[in-house]
């Protein structure tokens, strides 16, 4: 199963707290928030992740890479794709842009 994780916004409301990284990479304890999301998705069989990234998206890609460093609890490897936005596309635009990686009839979208 696949999921598109929308992670391309500017995070202006959290800028004073998380100025050095994109909002999904905000640290919760020792890990970025998005790692917890990926883990929970993988627990439920969603192991093909598409990150829709824009602002500081390279930080997301540097952290998650191709997903090979992350394994679902059942041992399934996690696969990661990146749909970069050259300019902010908004929610629907980001989903459309990430759609080129969708290979299944049904998929999840998380914001």
Model-derived regions, located:
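Conserved catalytic-core motifs of eukaryotic protein kinase domains, centered on the activation segment
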Residues: 16-19
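Conserved N-terminal catalytic core of the sugar/cofactor nucleotidyltransferase
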Residues: 2-5, 13, 27, 31-111
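Active-site glycine-centered loops adjacent to acidic/histidine catalytic or metal-binding residues
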Residues: 9
